């Protein structure tokens, strides 16, 4: 009997385009999920594929959606909402109507339990900070809750609770996949902008970049703590990367780079030539774009049973 396979899709705002390339590489190999768990933009991408057949054509359709997205479609400026939010009369700075329309257009099932592929969404209780796995109930509201970046979008009301972005509590919910019985987990992180020449200038860009650094650190810890409980395959996000999570202008580049990297990496995994042992927080000492690729994934030959992995030094970025 085949292993139960999960796809876990992390948050990352505009860097969610990276997951489109990764998904294409997976579906090209006919690697299909038995269940999908998503957080934030990963919930949007996950809900899209959970609505449709597990085919390359589905990913082509998702790519077309992403190519049509712009910053102002997701984060539309509204001076009045921003003013009221800044002075405490609203709990958010950006109207949610555009995001709600986007979610409604891409999720083709009304309730989570009606998805073609079992689909679960992670959100955060705005009051307690606890993480919630939403497995039943209104599907579009669940995705909207998971993507409700705190302070930017309003919380989503769900069964008497105010829910915000799942990335606050658990951006890459590997543990939930294992709890649901997954034996093989494909993890689709969006990565971080590791190759910037200077910190982001805008407030929203700085917020999203800082959150990406924070959640990456949690991911490293979670992979280390769970690696013996399931087969974890972490697809490598593009690196070096100098695209901020608020930049929708380089979607095509992100999709293509992610597809190329994921396809090559899966080839190595299929041949037993690569074992992902973890990631590292890093940046690049060279100027942006100064290297073709910095690989934060230490790759070693497969380790024989009972052996200890080598801890050889990798490239320092």
Model-identified regions with their sequence ranges:
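Catalytic domains of lipid- and phosphate-ester/thioester hydrolases
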Residues: 1-34, 45, 49-50, 59-60, ...
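Patatin-like phospholipase
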Residues: 2-103, 135-145, 189, 193, ...
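Catalytic cores of transferase enzymes with a strong primary signal for eukaryotic protein kinases
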Residues: 31-33, 129, 202
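Active-site-adjacent alpha/beta core region of enzyme catalytic domains
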Residues: 74-193, 225-276
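Short acidic, glycine/proline-enriched helix-loop-strand junctions
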Residues: 194-218, 228-233
């Amino acid at each position: 009997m085949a292993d139960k396979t999960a796809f876990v899709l992390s948050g990352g705002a505009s860097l969610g385009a990276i997951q489109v390339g990764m998904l294409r590489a997976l579906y090209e190999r006919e690697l299909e999920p038995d269940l999908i768990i998503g957080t934030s933009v990963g919930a949007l991408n996950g809900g899209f594929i959970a609505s449709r057949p597990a085919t390359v054509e589905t990913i082509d359709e998702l790519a077309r959606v992403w190519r049509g997205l712009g910053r102002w479609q997701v984060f539309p400026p509204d001076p009045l909402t921003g003013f009221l939010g800044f002075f405490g009369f609203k709990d958010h700075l950006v109207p949610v109507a555009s995001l709600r329309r986007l979610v409604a257009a891409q999720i083709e099932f009304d309730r989570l339990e009606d998805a073609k592929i079992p689909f679960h969404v992670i959100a955060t209780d705005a009051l307690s900070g606890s993480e919630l796995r939403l497995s039943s109930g209104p599907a579009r509201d669940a995705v909207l809750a998971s993507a409700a970046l705190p302070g930017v979008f309003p919380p989503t009301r769900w069964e008497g609770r105010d829910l915000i972005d799942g990335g606050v509590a658990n951006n890459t919910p590997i543990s939930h996949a294992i709890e649901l019985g997954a034996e093989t987990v494909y993890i689709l992180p969006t990565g971080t902008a590791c190759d910037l020449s200077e910190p982001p200038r805008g407030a929203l860009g700085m917020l999203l970049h800082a959150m990406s650094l924070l959640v990456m650190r949690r991911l490293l810890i979670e992979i280390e703590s769970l690696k013996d409980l399931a087969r974890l395959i972490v697809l490598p996000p593009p690196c070096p990367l100098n695209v901020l999570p608020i930049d929708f202008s380089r979607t095509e580049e992100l999709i293509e780079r992610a597809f190329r990297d994921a396809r090559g990496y899966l080839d190595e995994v299929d041949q037993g030539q690569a074992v992902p042992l973890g990631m590292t927080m890093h940046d690049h000492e060279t100027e942006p774009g100064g290297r073709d690729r910095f690989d934060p994934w230490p790759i070693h030959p497969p380790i024989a049973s009972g052996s200890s992995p080598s801890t050889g030094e990798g490239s320092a970025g």
